Amino acid sequence: MTPQDFYRTLEEDGFSLSSKQKEQFDTYFKLLVEWNTKINLTAITEENEVYPQHFYDSIAPILQAFLANEPIKLLDIGAGAGFPSLPMKILFPNLEVTIIDSLNKRISFLTLLAQELGLENVHFFHGRAEDFGQDKAFRGQFDVVTARAVARMQVLSELTIPFLKIGGKLIALKAQAADQELEEAKNALCLLFGKVIKNHSYQLPNGDSRFITIVEKKKETPNKYPRKAGLPNKKPL
């Protein structure tokens, strides 16, 4: 998929990009490839693969009408090279985006990237989700939390739901069908007062299947969650 194919596909979906937005995606791709030689950001570096597998996939929740171009507070956990939240931010500039990532080198890349792209209302923090999830400045503060290929739902729910306001939504982007994951995560979702409200499948332009699971937070998260860093992964709920 060339950039032109990408823009054409978005136009067919009702999104006509401005010259500025096209330049932002172009700059994003170039910086991604440049920095990937310094730190491990992605195994996908060919232009015709980055546009469908990273950019298109990242904005899928917007294309599927799960997000609006409003000043909602969005947190991206383990965004790595900025996926999915920064492509979302390019398409929907009104989003207020916060990213937490455990690797400081990735935060350095994201900070430079946001400056080069001219993105406003983006915030980057280095650390573990488990630690920030117990910080009152972050806990229960977000309308939406996104996570793309971060962890199985049994673990992911504990890393993300504490950040949500009541009524807020976790949007989890997956490469595999989530049915088995959701079965395993029933206890975790119950303890964290999260309810699955949508389990959606779609296709990338190349025909590959992808999946979006949306979980709504129904009540305040019990104070003991998230547990200490590493425990959610070692001993899932």
Curated annotation (Swiss-Prot):
GO terms for cellular component: cytosol. This is Ribosomal RNA small subunit methyltransferase G. Belongs to the methyltransferase superfamily. RNA methyltransferase RsmG family. S-adenosyl-L-methionine binds at G78, F83, A129, E130, R148. Specifically methylates the N7 position of a guanine in 16S rRNA. The keyword rRNA processing applies. Signal peptide: none annotated. Its main location: cytoplasm. InterPro entries: rRNA_ssu_MeTfrase_G, SAM-dependent_MTases_sf. It is found in: Cytoplasm. GO terms for molecular function: rRNA (guanine-N7-)-methyltransferase activity. The keyword NADP does not apply. Keywords: Cytoplasm, Methyltransferase, rRNA processing, S-adenosyl-L-methionine, Transferase. Its EC number is 2.1.1.-. It comes from Streptococcus pyogenes serotype M12 (strain MGAS9429).
